[in-house]
């Protein structure tokens, strides 16, 4: 939030409070899905991609439904998609974010230009074998579902390596009957696959399915797949990526282009048809969502400077910005409906931030 505000302060000072375009800072609601388990809630409502039926049934850990929580603060859930009008004339969207990974750290670089966000194929895979006594069943007579599932672990590393920049993760594994004296009858694993290119993501998925069938057959088992979630890759605007790369090089002397494995609000804005780019700041330890998550202050300062440079290079003849705090930020109200919109994104998990984003 502060980075976007600082950029707007510079713009306001440069144009004596009357910039030629409107620039807004948007504070998206519940990117992480922290309260209701639905990621990208605010941005998906704005992009029009929010599944209203699904969101209507979301419940927090206290049993409160999302529509009821919104109603308590005066927001009609059935109208949340109305905020999509804020993107109707948007010319550009810029988002600054920590990398949440080790790529920039390993290269000893403070900042990076983001090529886009990975598409995701997420499935539950269940291998079906036969329960049998662990003592009386010879090894060559077993139909061990866990054996078939376990063979997938090294295989997904080969699949990811063949794809180039793709990643594959088996994140969970459960067995039945789950007792020490029985061969595993059923083994369920979850597989998360991600890639920036749609075709390569499809290839990774097809290779994983083929491997599962092969390993199941070799173990005397069967296998079934259940899609848990899918989202297409969101490649960012090439011109904006170039501008971002230039701004970083002007600030730091060197830049690096990388994809984003995690999803971000920028993906929703991009899929809504708005030219989009992200800038990453190095994460210390290459770790996020952990108590040791941190970023160097000097890198944060560089990111604000680079964001400011990017905003200058990206401004069209006329421009609009989404205001998180109209009393603080630039923008004169002189812009017309044909104005462009450049948005510097700020991350906030509290519901108040979500509601603010939806109602601005």
What is each model feature region?
Residues 16-22, 80-84, 136, 157-170, ...:
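Flexible, glycine/charged-enriched surface loops at secondary-structure junctions
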Residues 30-31, 35-199:
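Midchain, well-structured core segments that form catalytic/ion-binding scaffolds
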Residues 53-54, 194-198, 228-230, 286-299:
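Short beta-alpha connecting loops at secondary-structure transitions
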Residues 115, 133, 137-163, 205-210, ...:
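His/Asp/Glu-rich mid-to-C-terminal helical/loop segments that flank catalytic regions of hydrolases
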Residues 169-179, 190-196, 222-241, 261, ...:
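A short beta-alpha structural unit
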Residues 185, 255-305:
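Zn-dependent metallopeptidase/amidohydrolase metal-coordination segment
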Residues 200-204:
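Solvent-exposed, non-transmembrane alpha-helical starts
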Residues 315-360:
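Intrinsically disordered, low-complexity acidic segments enriched in Asp/Glu and Pro
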């Amino acid at each position: 939030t502060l980075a976007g505000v600082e950029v707007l302060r510079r713009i306001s000072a440069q144009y004596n409070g009357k910039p030629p375009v409107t620039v807004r800072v948007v504070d998206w609601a519940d990117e992480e899905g922290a309260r209701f388990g639905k990621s990208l809630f605010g941005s998906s409502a704005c992009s029009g991609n929010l599944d209203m039926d699904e969101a209507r049934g979301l419940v927090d850990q206290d049993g409160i439904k999302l529509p009821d929580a919104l109603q308590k603060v005066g927001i009609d859930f059935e109208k949340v998609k109305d905020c999509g009008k804020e993107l109707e004339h948007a010319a550009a969207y810029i988002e600054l974010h920590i990398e949440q990974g080790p790529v920039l750290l390993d290269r000893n670089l403070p900042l990076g230009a983001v090529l886009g966000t990975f598409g995701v194929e997420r499935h539950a895979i269940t291998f079906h074998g036969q329960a049998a006594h662990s003592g009386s069943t010879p090894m060559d007579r077993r139909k061990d579902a866990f054996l078939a599932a376990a063979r997938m672990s090294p295989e997904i590393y080969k699949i990811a390596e063949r794809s180039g920049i793709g990643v594959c993760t088996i994140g969970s594994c459960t067995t039945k009957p789950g007792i020490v004296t029985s061969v595993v009858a059923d083994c369920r694993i979850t597989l998360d696959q991600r890639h920036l290119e749609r075709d390569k993501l499809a290839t990774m998925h097809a290779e994983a399915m083929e491997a599962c069938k092969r390993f199941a057959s070799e173990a005397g088992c069967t296998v079934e797949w259940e899609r848990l979630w899918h989202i297409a890759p969101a490649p960012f605007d090439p011109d904006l990526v170039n501008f971002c790369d230039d701004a970083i090089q002007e600030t730091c002397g060197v830049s690096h282009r990388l994809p984003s494995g995690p999803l971000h609000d920028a993906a929703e804005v991009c899929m809504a048809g708005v030219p989009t780019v992200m800038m990453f700041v190095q994460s210390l330890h290459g770790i996020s969502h952990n108590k040791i998550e941190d970023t160097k202050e000097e890198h944060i300062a560089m990111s604000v400077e680079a964001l400011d440079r990017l905003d200058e290079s990206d401004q069209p003849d006329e421009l609009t910005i989404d205001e998180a705090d109209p009393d603080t930020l630039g923008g004169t109200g002189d812009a017309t409906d044909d104005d462009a919109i450049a948005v510097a994104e700020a991350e906030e998990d509290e519901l108040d931030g979500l509601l603010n984003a939806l109602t601005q």
